[in-house]
């Protein structure tokens, strides 16, 4: 039985304002989720406007198919394929705005069967698209100590990465133990491995669960490819509006927008003529305003918005 979950879109008004919607414009919502941003964009489009939304989660696709609107098209796939989809629909250089709402939607987190959360027992899966790729349980069953440590440290920024990885490997190698296939098993294992001096407000498993989710879904590679694809398909003055949810994502977005706004960097002392420097290219984008965080009121209404950051850039 499928449960019904409420999903509150984060920084909804701010991210849509960042797109500077034109009624007859062409827009792409790279992360449909449960459609909060997409429906808001559609409400601001006129009869000639178009919205293309992307998601690789079958549940999100099912939700999108409820939208009966000739201006709307849903694409099933990873948002890293945005440039490919733009070519398919002849949109390259014509897109007036792209929105990315990174991270996991509330229904994904709240549905125990998806295996994203340590708060509810469920299969240890964590795949954004359950029809492809390897679940976390299968990866943990074969990964070595160094690989598990690296993933937790790199993508979870957890200072106890080695300690947690050792606990997982030791558990796995004990033939008396059940296979590690449930979120509750992994959460308890990590909690037990945490030092008694653990002081953080967050659950001890928070960072490790984040790390495994990012790794199993290749999230950072997806984001990097998606950002570059979005820059390539935007029309002049087209906007890129990106909401991130943790420091790894936000650093990627910040560095990307800074790099695109600076153009090629030529080291001092390299003897190049002005023509040669111009041939290297120029800045592709400019940042719009400052990074925005949710208001105290939004955080109170939706605690999951607390860590979110919105950044906006415009194609030159």
UniProtKB/Swiss-Prot annotation:
* GO (cellular component) term, any one: cytoplasm
| Subcellular location(s) of the protein | Cytoplasm
Q: Which GO terms describe its molecular function?
A: rRNA (cytosine-N4-)-methyltransferase activity
- InterPro entries cross-referenced by the UniProt entry: RsmH, SAM-dep_MeTrfase_MraW_recog, SAM-dependent_MTases_sf
Cite the Gene3D superfamilies for this sequence.
Putative methyltransferase TM0872, insert domain, Vaccinia Virus protein VP39
GO biological process entries: rRNA base methylation
Q: Give the catalysed reaction(s), semicolon-separated.
A: cytidine(1402) in 16S rRNA + S-adenosyl-L-methionine = N(4)-methylcytidine(1402) in 16S rRNA + S-adenosyl-L-homocysteine + H(+)
Check the record and name the HAMAP family matching this protein: 16SrRNA_methyltr_H
Q: Please state what the protein is called.
A: Ribosomal RNA small subunit methyltransferase H
């Amino acid at each position: 039985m499928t449960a019904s979950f409420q999903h509150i879109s984060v920084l909804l008004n701010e991210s849509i304002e960042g797109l500077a919607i034109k009624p007859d414009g062409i827009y792409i919502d790279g992360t449909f989720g449960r459609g909060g941003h997409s429906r808001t964009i559609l409400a601001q489009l006129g009869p000639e406007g178009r919205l293309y939304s992307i998601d690789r989660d079958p549940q999100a696709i099912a939700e999108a198919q409820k939208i009966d609107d000739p201006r709307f098209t849903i694409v099933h796939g990873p948002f890293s394929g945005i440039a490919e989809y733009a070519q398919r629909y002849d949109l390259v250089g014509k897109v007036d705005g792209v929105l990315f709402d990174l991270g996991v939607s509330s229904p994904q987190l709240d549905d125990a069967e998806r295996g994203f959360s340590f708060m509810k027992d469920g299969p240890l899966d964590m795949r954004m698209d359950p029809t492809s790729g390897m679940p976390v349980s299968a990866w943990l069953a074969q990964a070595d100590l160094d690989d598990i440590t690296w993933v937790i440290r790199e993508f979870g920024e957890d200072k106890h990465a080695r300690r947690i990885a050792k606990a997982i490997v030791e558990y796995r190698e004990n033939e008396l133990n059940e296979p590690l296939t449930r979120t509750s098993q992994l959460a308890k294992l990590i909690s037990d491995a945490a030092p008694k001096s653990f002081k953080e407000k967050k659950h001890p498993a928070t960072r490790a669960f984040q790390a495994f989710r990012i790794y199993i879904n290749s999230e950072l590679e997806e984001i990097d490819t998606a950002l570059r694809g979005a820059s390539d398909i935007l029309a002049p003055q087209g906007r890129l509006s990106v909401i991130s949810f943790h420091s790894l994502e936000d650093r990627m977005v910040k560095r990307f927008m800074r790099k695109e706004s600076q153009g090629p960097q030529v080291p001092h002392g390299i003897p190049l003529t002005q023509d040669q420097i111009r041939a290297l290219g120029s800045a592709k984008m400019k940042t719009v305003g400052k990074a925005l965080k949710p208001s105290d009121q939004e955080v109170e209404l939706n605690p999951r918005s607390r860590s979110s950051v919105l950044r906006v850039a415009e194609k030159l």
